Amino acid sequence: MAQTQYYGTGRRKSAIARVYTRTGTGQIRINDKSLEEYFGRKTDRMIVMQALEAVEMTDKLDVNVKVIGGGPSGQAGAIRHGLARALIELDEAMRPVLRKAGYVTRDAREVERKKVGLHKARRRPQYSKR
């Protein structure tokens, strides 16, 4: 008999993560690599683990993730968001805990576009009085 699998989609900046969870031993696979293999920075690994640690499920679930787009920081945030959604699908009672920690809300901050006549999004050319 097949195990029950729970799914959640997470987004952050331009990264999109599809997160699948099932009961297991706490193994995390991201694009067919281990968590340590995929994320070199400790901060990114911590961000991914935050949602599981908030509900104390670190060694009770196996997590399989497919993530595309963005950079390491955005991908870590997308995985955390997707994981929070998958955990809510698993047990609705986890929602208040995850909501209080801020993992359910999609971080809507995106890169501001560069404007014509400016160096960057807001950086103006140097002003010369004479």
Swiss-Prot record:
A biological process term (GO) from this entry: translation
Single GO term (MF): RNA binding
Entry keywords, A to Z: Ribonucleoprotein, Ribosomal protein
GO CC, alphabetical: cytosolic small ribosomal subunit
InterPro entries listed in its UniProt record: Ribosomal_Su5_D2-typ_SF, Ribosomal_uS9, Ribosomal_uS9_bac/plastid, Ribosomal_uS9_CS, Ribsml_uS5_D2-typ_fold_subgr
Superkingdom assignment: Bacteria
PROSITE patterns per the UniProt record, alphabetical: RIBOSOMAL_S9
UniProt cross-references to Pfam families, sorted A to Z: Ribosomal_S9
PANTHER family, A to Z: RIBOSOMAL PROTEIN S9, SMALL RIBOSOMAL SUBUNIT PROTEIN US9M
Listed NCBIfam families: PRK00132.1
Recorded family membership: Belongs to the universal ribosomal protein uS9 family.
Protein name in the entry: Small ribosomal subunit protein uS9
Organism lineage: Bacteria, Pseudomonadati, Pseudomonadota, Gammaproteobacteria, Methylococcales
